[in-house]
Amino acid sequence: MPKQAEYTWGSKKILDNIECLTEDVAEFKDLLYTAHRITSSEEESDNEIQPGAILKGTVVDINKDFVVVDVGLKSEGVIPMSEFIDSSEGLVLGAEVEVYLDQAEDEEGKVVLSREKATRQRQWEYILAHCEEGSIVKGQITRKVKGGLIVDIGMEAFLPGSQIDNKKIKNLDDYVGKVCEFKILKINVERRNIVVSRRELLEAERISKKAELIEQISIGEYRKGVVKNITDFGVFLDLDGIDGLLHITDMTWKRIRHPSEMVELNQELEVIILSVDKEKGRVALGLKQKEHNPWEDIEKKYPPGKRVLGKIVKLLPYGAFIEIEEGIEGLIHISEMSWVKNIVDPSEVVNKGDEVEAIVLSIQKDEGKISLGLKQTERNPWDNIEEKYPIGLHVNAEIKNLTNYGAFVELEPGIEGLIHISDMSWIKKVSHPSELFKKGNSVEAVILSVDKESKKITLGVKQLSSNPWNEIEAMFPAGTVISGVVTKITAFGAFVELQNGIEGLIHVSELSDKPFAKIEDIISIGENVSAKVIKLDPDHKKVSLSVKEYLADNAYDQDSRTELDFKDSQGPKERKKKGK
């Protein structure tokens, strides 16, 4: 008979409104119990697995966008296909893969898994197990980031810009894709990042190579190197790991101002080893030593006095360099450019690129110097200067320059003489030549002296006439009365111009026999005066005059003139009254 059966399942009650046999009810009860036990076991298992764990799962479905993985939890995880790119070749249904548990259950009750995080975790565990700071690892530079590059060493590591290379870096992109060895500088466990260096390995390799090369290298050996740096004093070459200096003086037998005239960066050169300092790790290189030294037989080839033809290659304030053959230059000093001109700048005579003839003056083989002369190719006009301009010769010359001490005149092109200020006038005290002469004017003068060695000629103008002071005693003996014009008034007297331009002085004490306050009260410039010569001093060119003595000698005439002048000063009426 059908009956209503009531069953309990823990705290739950199940009511079956069905008819069944007693044995069927017992079997169904067992099935329900088994299902309950399995479900409880899965829930307990889910609670034991924590996010962050790496699980093994089975691929149960694959499409172009996702991979479905069963890790034995209550739901399957869906992982983007992009996370399987590196291992997509072995990705098939049923394949076993490791995944990272992000979440055991999201908002929708699904398991969240990651293949990429699992891979990174395993890489990090490998690094910690097998590497430490200072370890050498191999990796590939994958991309450029701010401040440096990212390197794949099994996981991503940071390569700072300062640790990329041991030479100057122009473009970081040039390093992307390169596979190199790196040294681990720092491992940060908390942040899970690694800093590596390529530069330290390169530097260590360079030092090792340098030490090895220093031991192997020998003087006189030929080596190839690449120009890595150019300075004012020379060129540094990379000799396969060791730096060598090619000094500017060892680059060429010619004169160069800067190494860049001969070489450029990254240029390969074959050089000769000149010296090796093993203690300091320095190598001196030579380039010119590979060629014949043109200075070896220079003294035979260019003896002093030989005339040479060359090209002006350089002008400097003190002279001009002339190249007389490849690698051989000589200096024409500014003092050797002209016999007669005072050259201030070489460009007054020659220009760069000019071809000129010169005479070899001297050679300093050890110093690599040749002195040349340009003026020596012409006759020296001073050689016969004494015959051409004998003392006493009268000449007409143009005034070229005026100075405080005299006037320079040109006797012929390049030959000048000096008229000293003391040789300009016998009688006039000249303060400056411009009082008598003007630049550009012609003047007649007489040759006074010629100094061939120092190239000096002196002339005189006053010597064209006799010295009036030699005849002064005859012209103006003491006691003579003279007349002259007042030319200058000073505090001590008045100067009067006499015959032939000679000046005499009326001292203030000799101006009058009457008292006066100022000289100007009794005499003025331009006034004609009469005076008596009271003293002559030809050696010192002085003539002393006296108005007072002149007046005393002519007292009567002076008194008469004074009385007459007084009468003339009275009016006719006054004189008439006086007469009454």
From Swiss-Prot:
Keywords: Repeat, Ribonucleoprotein, Ribosomal protein, RNA-binding
Ranges for domain S1 motif: 52-116, 134-199, 220-288, 305-375, 392-462, 479-548
Family: Belongs to the bacterial ribosomal protein bS1 family.
Xref: InterPro entries: NA-bd_OB-fold (IPR012340), Ribos_protein_bS1-like (IPR050437), Ribosomal_bS1 (IPR000110), Ribosomal_protein_S1-like (IPR035104), S1_domain (IPR003029)
GO CC annotations on file: cytosolic small ribosomal subunit; symbiont-containing vacuole
Repeat listed as a keyword: yes
KW Cell membrane (keyword) present: no
GO biological process: translation
Naturally occurring in which organism (per UniProt): Chlamydia pneumoniae (Chlamydophila pneumoniae)
Stored PROSITE patterns: S1 (PS50126)
Alphabetical list of CDD domains matching this protein: S1_RPS1_repeat_ec1_hs1, S1_RPS1_repeat_ec2_hs2, S1_RPS1_repeat_ec3
One Gene Ontology term of the molecular function aspect: mRNA binding
Pfam families: S1
Record SUPFAM superfamilies: Nucleic acid-binding proteins (SSF50249)
Described purpose of this protein according to its UniProt entry: Binds mRNA; thus facilitating recognition of the initiation point. It is needed to translate mRNA with a short Shine-Dalgarno (SD) purine-rich sequence.
Name of this protein: Small ribosomal subunit protein bS1
Name of the encoding gene: rpsA
